[in-house]
């Protein structure tokens, strides 16, 4: 049963205090950062982008890949001088990396100037832990070994005013052999549907047009309930919310994307026609070693069923190369899968060892081979992405305007329902408007277009 967040301590600070949160990793971490920011602003802190101005710096960490951990350790080393110059600065490390016992100990040992270390299960305790650091003038290390339910009503400070992340569940039960997430995020816990619905209704009242439902495996939503309420039921309920324009969700596990869910996403008016379905590999032998729980044939049949019901569906994926034991034949099967599915885009990455996972004990593929394979995969996917986007030329697509582009204030950018980035001229259109855009040029990573007068 959800408990209410009570540790606000609103008057503990004054408005001159500044905070900086630096997040690494996935959308779940981005959403956690919004909660961290919300709690800090409840304490009277204001955001800053300058490290030297901050009174508190939180590093919200990731441990899915070694590169993310290396970035954190490098940043901590550089922050040492700032901590010496500003001894009252509170420096904290949280998130998935600090949830690992070995990593937390390493931080404590190598960076003793860190004031605060906590994990993924107790971020709602942040106000109390800050108060403890200030009152006792000593470091606080609190990493809960296990999750203790879901804490609702944590303050949230969102950067975006049009699109919002909404977490619907936490944790993962899948235990893929390469992945550390179940060990640092805990077992699956679903939020109550009424809490999710209420949050989205409040967002709509605040002017938000689009929500993305988040979970390590959203398709597992509700499996921990005693009743039969599942993800498809939640989507139908959200689709009925007045004023909401678009609904997205991620991430989906291909094994759990069943026929009922396909029927719901095909019929729901607000659920966007974009499905992120991480394949990871195209070889049955590798998929089995990964403990993915499905075969290549199952995956391809799922894609066929989705496109049969949603012909204009955009499919994206995560694809890994260099899993331990992957042969050239295995890799060729991944390339063939990409050719058959024709992903609109894919997040491609090289396997790297995660201590504590079963795959870490297997015979590894050489770095040279992994580097060569990832380049071949990227080249293939870039070509397919370009071809897919060129097919959009001449079509008129609905675009949610997000604002000016970063490089040219005369150009606006937005997203189609299939999550394709569109750039166009149209200074009279305000962020949040839905406009009709005729696509004039397809590029590998975006579409160029022009506003259709009167939407016709």
From Swiss-Prot:
Positions of the Radical SAM core domain: 158-387
Domain TRAM, chain residue ranges per copy: 390-453
Listed InterPro entries: Elp3/MiaA/NifB-like_rSAM (IPR006638), Methylthiotransferase (IPR005839), Methylthiotransferase_CS (IPR020612), Methylthiotransferase_N (IPR013848), Methylthiotransferase_N_sf (IPR038135), MiaB_methiolase (IPR006463), rSAM (IPR007197), rSAM_horseshoe (IPR023404)
Compartmental location: Cytoplasm
UniProt remark on cofactor binding: Binds 2 [4Fe-4S] clusters. One cluster is coordinated with 3 cysteines and an exchangeable S-adenosyl-L-methionine.
GO MF terms, alphabetically ordered: 4 iron, 4 sulfur cluster binding; metal ion binding; N6-isopentenyladenosine methylthiotransferase activity
Catalytic reaction list: N(6)-dimethylallyladenosine(37) in tRNA + (sulfur carrier)-SH + AH2 + 2 S-adenosyl-L-methionine = 2-methylsulfanyl-N(6)-dimethylallyladenosine(37) in tRNA + (sulfur carrier)-H + 5'-deoxyadenosine + L-methionine + A + S-adenosyl-L-homocysteine + 2 H(+)
Sequence positions that bind [4Fe-4S] cluster 2: 172, 176, 179
E.C. number: 2.8.4.3
Keywords noted in UniProt: 4Fe-4S, Cytoplasm, Iron, Iron-sulfur, Metal-binding, S-adenosyl-L-methionine, Transferase, tRNA processing
Any one of the GO CC terms: cytosol
Residue ranges occupied by any MTTase N-terminal domain in the UniProt entry: 17-135
Organism superkingdom: Bacteria
SUPFAM superfamilies tied to this protein: Radical SAM enzymes
Cofactor(s) it depends on: [4Fe-4S] cluster
Subunit structure and binding partners: Monomer.
Record PANTHER family: CDK5 REGULATORY SUBUNIT-ASSOCIATED PROTEIN 1, MITOCHONDRIAL TRNA METHYLTHIOTRANSFERASE CDK5RAP1
Descriptive protein name: tRNA-2-methylthio-N(6)-dimethylallyladenosine synthase
Organism (species): Desulforamulus reducens (strain ATCC BAA-1160 / DSM 100696 / MI-1)
